[in-house]
């Protein structure tokens, strides 16, 4: 790897230098070939294993942990920071630079009495969801690898430590801006320094002046809205949408007790620590706006409040339009030639009625969309009909759907197109859990197979139909904790 060190050299007050503590008996548990290509790597090597497990220095790396704050479950925490993630720098790849971070690399000044470690189960989950989201075309950070060890760590019980090697276009979060506005009062100069760095590094088409700052914030609003639109379309619940877990670039970030929907449930909660459902699946669009409002508050020393409010008022449209585009593609609806508020409203109603029917009939979200690939949209008798208990309500919806769909000249091509946007395979929690149990038993094959399937989620993989099934009884409604 070849590194540059722009964050390290230009923002010295934004981090603490800290070196990783190596894990014992490191071994490759998983590796992403296409993530490796982003930073110019090919195959995992023994030398790389030693470096990324914290047991040897990586040439060109400067190790550091970033400081930031954030709103966690609605309350402001004035000092957070990377408690177990150590950044090596920005690795230069063929198409840009990516931060390389060792998540679980050991304690930092921000560990808050934690051990700075990640357990194997959380490392595997982060790796798999990074692969899954990327191949579902959802904006996300990436995971290069998972490195296992025999190092014991204690959570609710004894587990083994592991490291996720995370790649991110940037690790700058909403919480970075909050820290230098609220926690370090009177440091508007540092806020401006961070803003200028962010624009120069990631928005080089914008200027570092009043007009550029407003254009930048609008882009952040749009990117955040687009990310959440993708989450809602694929049925992904993040679980911990604190502002310190929000990437300034609109990439899915900091995965903990996440889940993909099995049975469709608007108020689905995937986080054991969120009994009131603040971050429930259906709440995510609203939380996205709330988090952007917190970011806007942090930017008031730099951008006038009236301008911030005007930009925030564009969030709803920035969310709805990509969501409509994604959902129209899932349903096979033709794109609207001339944008129309009325047509958007009608399509949102059609989509909403369909998901309400899914919830009422306790249907699997992913499987139901995939069934459209078997549908003859010209037939009065839908293959989907048998899945619904209240067929009269389905018939009413299906009639409206056919009317909106219009004529379909090439049915096989239409079906193929549906299968290209409606995945057959998602990272169901029970599949991740089965892979983790196998790793604990020394068997990496289920993990590697699951990774392979998740990199091709739209393919049939007829020999692996079992990975597309709804969860067994024990795997239904699994709720994960933040313990990792």
Curated annotation (Swiss-Prot):
Keywords: ATP-binding, Magnesium, Manganese, Metal-binding, Nucleotide-binding, Nucleotidyltransferase, Transferase. Mg(2+) binds at residues 245, 254. It catalyses: L-seryl-[protein] + ATP = 3-O-(5'-adenylyl)-L-seryl-[protein] + diphosphate; L-threonyl-[protein] + ATP = 3-O-(5'-adenylyl)-L-threonyl-[protein] + diphosphate; L-tyrosyl-[protein] + ATP = O-(5'-adenylyl)-L-tyrosyl-[protein] + diphosphate; L-histidyl-[protein] + UTP = N(tele)-(5'-uridylyl)-L-histidyl-[protein] + diphosphate. InterPro entries: SelO. Its EC number is 2.7.7.-, 2.7.7.108. The keyword Nucleotidyltransferase applies. Its cofactor is Mg(2+); Mn(2+). Disulfide bonds: none annotated. The active site is at residue 244. It holds the Pfam family SelO. It comes from the Bacteria. Belongs to the SELO family. This is Protein nucleotidyltransferase YdiU. The gene is ydiU.
